[in-house]
């Protein structure tokens, strides 16, 4: 199993949980296209970067909406990575970025990754946040999707998530 981005579960609700994610480094590309196209187009240069530099694959693969048909796709770098010792990519589209600590509301769902399934679960999570009086941080494109499994894994075993940054003071 791949190393996963480090977090602590702060609170569990019936249908989602609040997590405190540790700071991390990511390799990221910006991609134009539909949600599904962006996931495919963005994966290749990131996979080439880690493969060419002998960097372990981690989970999840993160996809963030920028605006209509524009996305950021990222791989989390292994724990212990330091921006000063990660190689510079030969592909100028791949950027290494530091992501700060943050609280996220996370909703898990299984199956194949599709726009309809993503939209449904995003709406479920947003409704749950309203129900629990938890405030989102950012605008309507503040969410990110997280895919944890390789494409060849049977769909009923695949783990996906919607993650929304939240204010958490409890």
Regions found by a protein language model. Give the residues of each.
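A solvent-exposed interaction/effector surface
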Residues: 1-170
């Amino acid at each position: 199993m791949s190393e996963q981005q480090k977090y602590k579960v702060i609170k569990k609700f019936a249908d989602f949980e609040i997590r405190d994610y540790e700071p991390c480094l990511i390799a990221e590309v910006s991609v134009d296209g539909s949600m599904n196209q962006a996931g495919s187009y963005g994966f290749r240069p990131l996979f080439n970067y880690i493969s060419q530099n002998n960097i372990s694959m981690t989970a999840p693969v993160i996809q963030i909406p920028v605006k209509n048909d524009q996305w950021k796709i990222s791989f989390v770098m292994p724990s212990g990575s330091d921006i000063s010792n990660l190689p510079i990519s030969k592909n100028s589209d791949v950027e290494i970025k530091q992501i700060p600590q943050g609280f996220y509301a996370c909703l898990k769902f299984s199956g194949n990754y599709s726009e309809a399934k993503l939209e449904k679960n995003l709406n479920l999570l947003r409704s749950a946040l309203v129900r629990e009086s938890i405030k989102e941080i950012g605008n309507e494109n503040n969410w990110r999707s997280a895919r944890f499994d390789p494409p060849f894994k049977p769909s009923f075993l695949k783990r996906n998530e919607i993650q929304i940054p939240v204010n958490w003071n409890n």
